[in-house]
């Protein structure tokens, strides 16, 4: 055993260092004051620095790192198989390879926990704003759903449509506007006031669609990344959602709420439409579960072109329903829950409580 440790001393020290970081993280995550200091005074400024540095490049550094990681994984697998075949001491060689892989995995876990996982235990948007997603009454849900449907219909008159009657817009223009979309919220929520880095479109967006993702925030580069292949009608609200993560907000319900609020209040027609659309979709889904007839009545009041957009969006995502999307969303759900968010990906639906309480 001593020989095994001595022969792999560096890998063992690496393992112990990662383990120590993770142990300290789990010990201190319950100390709200310490976590708040770490998040808002250390990691958030650091991620903003990374975001500014990466903003100078016209492509997503996060996507590049994912590609490099995939290529590196294949190369390492080939090298390790070759090493195991040539080694005379198969057991020791296998142990060394397994230890190396474990070290890499724990390094990523430790870094992710420090840069992003800690945010789950810091004061969130609701803590800092005083808003709370209290359970809502049926009457409030119906009233706010109708309110969003009415404003969605109005917003629809100010956007462009293609020859098929579907929403159309220059996607790059939507991305370019994103760094000003939160300006309208700073008076009400001054703690949100910080420089934004524009979201970046992902080149391999179809892969994101297969995984059922419209966007993601990458803490290792401070970049917000968005799917450029999915229906354009919600691209603006996706941008606003991902920009909330640049502010250290981890809760998906709070990010969706902020996306709706910022989009509907800003002075860009494409963002207005996406904001009212995102809110209506969440509210409508919640209403349908409790009263399909009330949902149908509101749905029937929508102009035909909005219904066309909704059907196109549903048809687009229907083609990607399968094992890949199921597995990916399951892993994402488990990751979110591992950091104490009991709702997991279900928290995307809890935005309804915030919307109804705010607009009722």
Range-by-range predicted roles:
Residues 19-82:
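Membrane-embedded alpha-helical segments of integral membrane proteins
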Residues 139-143, 148, 250-294:
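Post-HExxH zinc-binding segment in Zn-dependent metallohydrolases
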Residues 160-228, 232:
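Auxiliary, metal-adjacent structural segments of Zn-dependent hydrolase domains
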């Amino acid at each position: 055993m001593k020989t095994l440790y001595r022969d792999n001393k560096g890998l063992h020290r690496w393992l112990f260092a990662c383990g120590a970081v993770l142990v300290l993280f789990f010990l201190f995550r319950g100390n709200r004051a310490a976590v708040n200091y770490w998040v808002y005074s250390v990691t958030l400024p650091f991620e903003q620095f990374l975001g500014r540095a990466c903003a100078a490049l016209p492509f997503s550094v996060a996507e590049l790192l994912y590609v490099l990681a995939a290529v590196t994984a294949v190369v390492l697998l080939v090298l390790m198989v070759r090493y195991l075949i040539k080694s005379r001491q198969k057991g020791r060689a296998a142990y060394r390879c397994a230890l190396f892989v474990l070290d890499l995995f724990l390094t990523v876990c430790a870094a992710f926990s420090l840069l992003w996982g800690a945010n789950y235990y810091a004061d969130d948007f609701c803590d800092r704003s005083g808003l709370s997603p209290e359970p809502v009454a049926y009457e409030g849900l119906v009233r706010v759903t109708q309110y969003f449907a009415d404003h969605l219909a109005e917003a629809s008159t100010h956007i462009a449509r293609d020859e098929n009657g579907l929403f159309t817009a220059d996607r790059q223009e939507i991305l370019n506007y994103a760094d000003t979309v939160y300006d309208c919220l700073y008076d009400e929520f001054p703690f949100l006031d910080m420089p934004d880095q524009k979201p970046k479109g992902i080149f391999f967006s179809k892969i994101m669609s297969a995984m059922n993702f419209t966007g993601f925030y990458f803490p290792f580069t401070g970049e917000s990344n968005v799917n450029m292949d999915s229906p354009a009608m919600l691209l603006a609200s996706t941008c606003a959602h991902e920009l909330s993560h640049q502010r250290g907000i981890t809760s998906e319900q709070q990010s969706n709420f902020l996306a709706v609020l910022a989009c509907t209040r800003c002075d860009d027609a494409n963002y207005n439409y996406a904001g009212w659309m995102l809110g209506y979709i969440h509210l409508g889904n919640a209403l349908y579960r409790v009263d399909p007839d009330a949902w149908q009545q509101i749905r029937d009041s929508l102009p035909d072109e909005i219904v066309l957009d909704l059907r196109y969006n549903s048809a687009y995502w229907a083609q990607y329903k399968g094992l890949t999307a199921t597995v990916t969303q399951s892993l994402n759900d488990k990751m979110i829950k591992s950091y104490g968010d009991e709702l997991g990906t279900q928290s995307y639906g809890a935005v309804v409580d915030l919307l109804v309480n705010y607009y009722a």
